[in-house]
Amino acid sequence: MKLDATDVRYITPDEFRVLTAVEMGSKNHEVVPTHLIAQISSLRHTGISKLLSGLLKRRLVARVRNNVYDGFRLTYGGYDYLAVRALSKRKSVYGIGNQIGIGKESDIYIVSTEEGECRVLKIHRLGRISFRNIKEKRDYMGKRKSASWMYMSRLAAEKEYAFMQILHQHGFPVPTPVDQNRHTLLMSYEDAYPLRQISVLPLDQIRRLYSALMALIVRLARAGLIHGDFNEFNLLVREIRNEEEDDSVSAEGDTPATDVRSEGVVEHGKGFTRIVKADSASEEESEEEDEEEDDTSPLNQVVELGEGVQVEPILIDFPQMVSTDHPNADMLFDRDVNCVRRFFRKRFRFESEEFPTFAEVMETVRRDESERLDVLCLLYTSPSPRDLS
């Protein structure tokens, strides 16, 4: 499911009211009957059909027919619109740009504020192509026995936002959390490269980066946390620039904010703005551009950093984080360490005999419990061990 904010400005307040009613009805109904939608939205039953028909055409809701009664269910598209509208009303998001990342459990978009500041919107989409036994592998539901994919996506976003806030407050290298609504998470834009895209690094920086990543794993563990998915897909690498370089870059106008508005035109609607391609472009040209973007997409580009550059890591993706008190904490810690070691061995032909172990780190933690963060109260620790490999 790809976010398309084109029709957000065309949806009327009554249609959003109906969409919200379907969402509220979904808490207790897998299929929400029409009369319940009318009751929750406080609209006339005769007008509900027309409003639902419009939402149905935009694929924001889906009609479900069964033997007992007919009704509607909310789609991920409708859930996206509700979240985007809420962020827009809070002035957190003004325009939506291109998709800059896609994963098994989420989609990443670049967005902008009314002042032109770039931000990153992460939309959780559990159950799309991610592992289907996620209800057992991740502690999203707590004591609940069952839940919909949308509800778990919302729990994942809330959990990640809480982790990001605590980590950012304690000085960990993570993006700045900005806002969160439903299954979406808004954070600061970091001018950095995904570690998986970097193919060449100076030897001194390879050692420096390896040491920084191992130190970050240890620092998290000393704070009572284990990332659980510490690999090249969840790590960004940022170039360290001095003030003179930053001034020269800003003087040239090479800022992230220009990336969102570099192509296309800005369309203004009812409380929302979307960046689209120019109207003069034909459909054939658009298709050709899409094909070219697939080949030269930033997601597939290889980055080479030459001599003289200095780098530092930024950690992302936190829904799967667990406490060091988790029954599988030692296995998860060792897996994080081995992911880094394996990547550096394959990508940079670099291998070090120096790496942390869970037992050694926990021994130092027992001597000084004051380093553990308050974030532990946010964690749900499984009562019994689970196979999380």
What positions do the PLM features span?
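A short, conserved structural fragment
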Residues: 58-66
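Single conserved hydrophobic/aromatic residue that forms the stacking wall/gate
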Residues: 380-389
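ATP-dependent phospho-/nucleotidyl transfer catalytic cores
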Residues: 8, 51, 77, 133, ...
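Short amphipathic alpha-helical interface segments
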Residues: 12-31, 35, 39-40
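Short amphipathic alpha-helical interaction segments
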Residues: 42-54
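Short alpha-helical segments that sit at the start of domains
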Residues: 1-17
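Conserved ATP-binding subdomain of kinase catalytic cores across diverse folds
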Residues: 80-193
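Catalytic-loop of the protein kinase fold
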Residues: 225-228, 232
